[in-house]
């Protein structure tokens, strides 16, 4: 199923975490739309700010390290410059050593891109993944996608 086929993903109200990111002139393609690289940068900004927010609001989780294992993107329409982008995020699923973030990019209340990103919890020492500690699992659960 495509991300856009889930009606929860098309409304910004179902995402528990939000931030507004301004667009830049350098984000524009020849057709005066936000280019695909800029769209991925906006998703990245959402992921980074969300994980930073988790560390600030849930000090018991410490400083977990995550790696992007997979990203899927649905482009629904063009993003516009100079309009700000409303980046919305929720936790779509929690596994034993990873979690899936559900992200949406909105302008003027309308979704123009959706993404799912699987984040793997990295082991503190050496290569490989590590189980999600209970404090981190609980913090992630607070941001479950409605």
Which residues does each predicted region cover?
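Short, flexible helix/strand-to-coil boundary loops that buttress conserved ligand/catalytic motifs
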Residues: 54-55, 144
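Helix-adjacent hinge/juxtasegments
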Residues: 65, 69-91
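HotDog/MaoC-like acyl-thioester-processing domains
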Residues: 2-19, 75, 79-81, 92-146
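Catalytic strand-loop segment that frames the active site of acyl-thioester-processing enzymes
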Residues: 2-49, 53
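A broad, structural micro-motif
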Residues: 34, 66-68, 112
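Residue-level signal for pocket-adjacent positions within structured domains
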Residues: 23-25, 29, 61-62, 127, ...
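Short, basic/aromatic beta-hairpin or loop at an interaction surface
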Residues: 58-66
């Amino acid at each position: 199923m495509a991300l856009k086929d889930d009606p929860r993903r098309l409304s910004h109200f179902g995402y528990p975490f939000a931030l507004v990111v301004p667009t830049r002139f350098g984000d524009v393609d020849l057709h005066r739309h936000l280019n695909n690289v800029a769209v991925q940068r906006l998703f990245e900004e959402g992921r980074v700010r969300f994980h930073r927010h988790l560390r600030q609001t849930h000090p018991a989780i410490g400083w977990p390290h995550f790696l992007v294992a997979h990203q899927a993107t649905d482009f629904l329409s063009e993003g516009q410059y100079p309009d700000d982008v409303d980046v919305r995020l929720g936790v779509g699923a929690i596994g034993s050593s990873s979690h899936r973030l559900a992200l949406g990019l909105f302008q003027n209340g309308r979704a123009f891109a959706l993404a799912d990103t699987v984040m793997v919890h990295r082991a503190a020492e050496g290569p490989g993944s590590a189980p999600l500690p209970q404090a981190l699992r609980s913090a992630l659960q607070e941001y479950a996608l409605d």
